[in-house]
Amino acid sequence: MTGFPKPRTLFLASISLLAAISLTGCGSNSFSFGGGDTRNKMIVSVRDQKMLLVHDGTPVKAYKISTSKFGIGDRPGSNCTPLGRLQVAKKIGDGAPIGSVFKTRRQTGEVLRPNAPGRDPVVTRILWLTGTESRNQNTFRRTIYIHGTPEERRLGSPASFGCIRMGSRDVADLYNRIGAGADVFVIRGSIQSNRSSADSSASVGKIGFR
């Protein structure tokens, strides 16, 4: 995928970010479903409108996404994307065809192509998120998801109503890679700008980008 940082840059950035997050994001006012997928983590940059998937501490894939057009926040009814440490609480859509439309998390039977005119439903897969911090603990009740969107032309800029949108094939790919319980860290800043404290001697494996 064009416009993404180089693999080495992403590797160093992810180490720095995860180290910083581990020091600041798990205080005494935190909540967690516990258990589940502890090997995969996702870092979502609001500034970059990109998601980095990290497996066992190594970045494996980057995706173009879209967060809320109303900004960031946790207030009910605000349609904002929450910041902080979230977790995948439920996975919905096993085996659904690419482009399958969901309404209240149930398939309607309709299938849409990317950029279908005049349509903006939840499609393909749903990763229902829960908050793990006092500030974002209402995330599950607010029904904040990572989900597919037919409006793929708008990915890379804020366009959602609070959820984290992905292209249909990308969200299906992510869905197959991670399990319930995986952490999702939503940050204001850029992934690249947080790389300075990383270990520059770390080795980098091959990363699959699209």
Model region roles, listed by residue range:
Residues 64-96:
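Electropositive
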Residues 33-57:
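Post-signal peptide N-terminal segment of mature Sec-exported envelope proteins
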Residues 22-25:
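C-terminal motif of bacterial Sec signal peptides marking the signal peptidase cleavage site
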Residues 29-33, 37, 75-78, 96-210:
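Exported/periplasmic cell-wall-interacting domains
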Residues 2-14:
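Bacterial N-terminal signal peptides that target proteins for export
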